[in-house]
């Protein structure tokens, strides 16, 4: 019997080791898998490479992981904003590396990894510092930059509902990078508000099929509510 559900956050993040590359879902705090991140902090794993849309908000979720000193490098599209002071302080002190990737390229590089695409050409970033050291090519009179896929050892994502096969549905903006990150990682770990019985999820509403998800863990109602308030 296929059963991808885990009883606790701690068991769901077991096996994440020093030096892992981890994708973290979320657009700001929307869809941020805060409980999984807290579980990751508790493992004590260090020297992590984090791939995410931004570099943390306030002192929760991804920012808390940065505060714990667990991260060696961040790959993201939007590292600076009014509440990204944790990352800002670490970066200015030379304690963390940064790779900036334009948001469209970030999404496409993740999707390329999940789809088995070796590389792709994008016009975004041509002629800027972001294109330094990368192959360029003229196609139909326009210049493009060769972008490589982004793979990860693990993906931490947040979904609304899941079943024991790993099928997932999302709520509104919380969906964001979750589906493509699940495809691009060797092990996708999803925290959900509710685990439902097989057949309860309308196949037309399933965004991430279970084939792309290895672990599912339910977050308690109280914990989910506290995260929602933070969002």
UniProtKB/Swiss-Prot annotation:
Pathway per the UniProt entry: Aromatic compound metabolism; beta-ketoadipate pathway; acetyl-CoA and succinyl-CoA from 3-oxoadipate: step 1/2
SUPFAM superfamilies according to UniProt: NagB/RpiA/CoA transferase-like (SSF100950)
Biological process (GO), any one: beta-ketoadipate pathway
Keywords: Aromatic hydrocarbons catabolism, Transferase
Pfam families: CoA_trans (PF01144)
Reactions mediated catalytically: 3-oxoadipate + succinyl-CoA = 3-oxoadipyl-CoA + succinate
EC number: 2.8.3.6
Entry binding sites for CoA: 25-31
One GO MF term: 3-oxoadipate CoA-transferase activity
Alphabetical list of InterPro entries matching this protein: 3-oxoacid_CoA-transf_A (IPR012792), CoA_trans_fam_I (IPR004165), CoA_transf_BS (IPR004163), NagB/RpiA_transferase-like (IPR037171)
Superkingdom in the source lineage: Bacteria
Cysteine-cysteine disulfides: none
Residues annotated as transmembrane: none
Quaternary state and interactors: Heterodimer.
Membership in a protein family: Belongs to the 3-oxoacid CoA-transferase subunit A family.
Cited NCBIfam families: pcaI_scoA_fam
Protein name, per record: 3-oxoadipate CoA-transferase subunit A
Organism: Pseudomonas putida
Gene giving rise to this polypeptide: pcaI
């Amino acid at each position: 019997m296929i059963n991808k559900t885990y009883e606790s956050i701690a068991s769901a993040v077991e096996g994440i080791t020093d030096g892992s590359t981890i994708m973290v879902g979320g657009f700001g705090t929307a869809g941020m898998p805060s409980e999984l991140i807290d579980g990751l902090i508790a493992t004590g794993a260090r020297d992590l490479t984090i791939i995410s849309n931004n570099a943390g908000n306030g002192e929760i979720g991804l920012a808390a992981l940065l505060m714990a000193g667990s991260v060696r490098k961040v790959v993201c599209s939007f590292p600076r904003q009014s509440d990204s002071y944790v990352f800002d302080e670490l970066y200015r002190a030379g304690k963390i590396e940064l790779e900036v990737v334009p948001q469209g390229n970030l999404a496409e590089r993740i999707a390329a990894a999940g789809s088995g695409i070796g590389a792709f050409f994008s016009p975004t970033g041509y002629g800027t510092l972001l294109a330094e050291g990368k192959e360029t090519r003229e196609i139909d009179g326009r210049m493009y930059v060769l972008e490589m896929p982004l793979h990860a050892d693990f993906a931490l994502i947040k979904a609304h509902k899941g079943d024991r096969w790993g099928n997932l549905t999302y709520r509104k903006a919380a969906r964001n990078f979750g589906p493509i990150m699940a495809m691009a990682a060797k092990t996708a770990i999803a925290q959900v508000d509710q685990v439902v019985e097989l057949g309860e999820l309308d196949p037309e509403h399933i965004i991430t099929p279970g084939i792309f998800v290895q672990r599912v863990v339910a977050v308690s109602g109280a914990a989910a509510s506290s995260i929602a308030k933070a969002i």
